[in-house]
Regions:
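Charge-rich, low-complexity N-terminal segments
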Residues: 1-54, 97
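Short secondary-structure junctions and interdomain/linker hinges
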Residues: 38, 90-93, 132-135
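Short N-terminal mixed-charge amphipathic segments
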Residues: 46-65, 69-70
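Short, internal acidic amphipathic alpha-helical interface segments
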Residues: 64-107
Length: 140
């Protein structure tokens, strides 16, 4: 590469001057603008609540943003067969069972080298809300 092109890139191969990540406060502001209340903020994650469901939001190095929900259930209503079927039918996120047979939903917004857009964050929350509703319909 010429010196000109080398000057455009950081040592990691990323284009200089383009921020590929949102700060925690920027994502919190986007979620608050959408009417979500954020009630726990740690350095590496925060929790928002909607319709009685806690959603953990984790920003990762590189700009990816992970959303996940865990459901506790003492009645053992979650079956691997149903979870697998939901993963086949709804590929927007991932349903899974933990080792202690609790249901989880994960949705990962991947940074493709550009910045994840505000609309992608809003669509991600909408998709997670849809998956939450499907899980509640299926298991409760």
């Amino acid at each position: 590469m010429s010196n000109f092109f080398n000057s455009l890139f950081s040592d990691k191969g990323e284009i200089k001057g383009i921020n590929t990540q949102y700060s925690v406060s920027e994502i919190v502001d986007i979620l608050k603008e959408e009417g979500h209340s954020i009630y726990l903020i740690q350095d590496n994650f925060w929790v928002l609540k909607w319709q009685g469901t806690n959603v953990v939001v984790v920003p990762h190095d590189g700009g990816d943003i992970q959303f996940w929900i865990m459901y506790n259930d003492d009645e053992n209503r979650f079956s691997l067969r149903k979870v697998n079927k939901m993963n086949i039918d709804y590929r927007v996120g991932k349903f899974y069972l933990t080792d202690d047979e609790q249901l989880g939903i994960e949705l990962l917004l991947r940074n493709d080298g550009n910045r994840i857009t505000k609309s992608q964050i809003i669509q991600g929350i909408a998709a997670l809300s849809l998956l939450d509703g499907l899980a509640k319909k299926e298991f409760w």
